Swiss-Prot record:
Subcellular location: Cell membrane
Pfam families: Bestrophin
Chief location bin: membrane
Name recorded for this polypeptide: Voltage-dependent anion channel-forming protein YneE
Species this protein is from: Escherichia coli O157:H7
Family recorded in the similarity comment: Belongs to the anion channel-forming bestrophin (TC 1.A.46) family.
Cellular component terms (Gene Ontology): plasma membrane
Keyword presence, Transmembrane helix: yes
Protein's UniProt keywords contain Cytoplasm: no
One example GO MF annotation: chloride channel activity
Gene: yneE
Alphabetical UniProt keywords: Cell membrane, Ion transport, Membrane, Transmembrane, Transmembrane helix, Transport
Stored InterPro entries: Bestrophin-like (IPR021134), YneE/VCCN1/2-like (IPR044669)
Length: 304
């Protein structure tokens, strides 16, 4: 996620970091060079009686813009839902530890439970990003729990099971009444719902055929556009073609980023920062001495 301070409108025009321009610049350069080639080809295909007009490109451009808008809205809806789910995880984690800490007198046992919660957040983050988990989870889980988690097809769900087992032990030991156990178990169910929601987004992409047809149409439009522009614009064709192509290609590229909000690209969710905030909150609630530093944006204003 790009987290920038408010900028002057003129300065924002020239922003590079965080823009999709860095990803599509090579494609725009090819469009520029192809437009120059079309200028030299103009006498040849005019001599053959081939004539392109702007009318069909105007109609096609409007249609592409509408469908790009639909796709971007679908991608942004996934992004917003993903952010809401991680917000719910933060709320449920704080509430669960608060209820446990104010109920159970054993601080060492509560500390173990807090570390399970932190491990769950990091495990979910790394699962969604397909990152290795052993080194990070080893800081929070006991050896036997770590082995159980790593052996599972759903590590985050296994941690939830361990948390449920921990609550069951407290209930059997008489530390929790039936009513409190049900209340705390409901919190675990809330966290489980977050896990299922994130998995739904991560493993259900926007239909490939829809993405493919829009992607093809955008690039065919950008390839054919110089032939229609060159008749009237001549040597200005490369500049206008690149400007129009930038609009369509950048929207197509942005939609690809928003489709998977859990990645590490510029416009994805800052899961590292969210997990860091959860960890800091839970450790401070448990009066821990060692608190990690807050994750801040880098020099390019990117928060991962």
């Amino acid at each position: 996620m790009i987290v920038r301070p408010q900028q002057h409108w003129l300065r924002r025009i020239f922003v590079w970091h965080g823009s999709v321009l860095s990803k599509i610049s090579s494609r725009l350069l090819l469009n520029f060079l192809f437009s120059i080639a079309v200028i030299f080809m103009l006498p040849w295909y005019t001599h053959l009686g081939i004539k392109f007009t702007l009318a069909p490109f105007s109609i096609l451009g409007v249609a592409i813009a509408i469908f790009l808008g639909f796709r971007n809205n679908a991608g942004y809806a996934r992004y917003v839902e993903a952010r809401k789910l991680w917000g719910q995880l933060m709320i449920a984690s704080r509430s669960l530890l608060r209820e446990v800490k104010t109920t159970l007198p054993d601080s060492a046992s509560v500390r173990e439970f807090a570390r399970l919660q932190i491990a769950f957040a990091h495990c979910l983050r790394m699962t969604l990003r397909k990152q290795p988990q052993v080194e990070v989870l080893a800081h929070y889980l006991k050896t036997e729990d770590l082995q159980r988690v790593l052996a599972s097809n759903s590590p985050a769900n296994r941690i939830l099971l361990i948390m449920g087992e921990w609550l069951a032990v407290q209930r059997r030991n008489g530390q929790l009444s039936d009513i409190l156990f049900i209340s705390l178990n409901d919190r675990l169910n809330d966290i489980s719902a977050v896990l299922a929601g994130c998995e739904r987004i991560a493993y259900t992409p926007i239909p490939f055929a829809y993405t493919l047809i829009l992607h093809r149409t955008v690039y065919l439009f950008c390839i054919m556009l110089p032939f229609a522009l060159v008749v009237d614009l001549h040597y200005m064709t490369p500049f206008i073609s690149v400007l129009i192509s930038y609009t369509f290609i950048s929207l197509d590229c942005l939609a690809e980023e928003l489709e998977d909000p859990f990645g590490t690209e510029n416009n994805d969710l800052p899961l590292d920062a969210i997990c860091n905030a959860i960890e800091i909150d839970l450790l401070q609630m448990n009066d821990e001495a060692e608190i990690p530093a807050k994750v801040l944006p880098d020099r390019h204003y990117q928060l991962t």
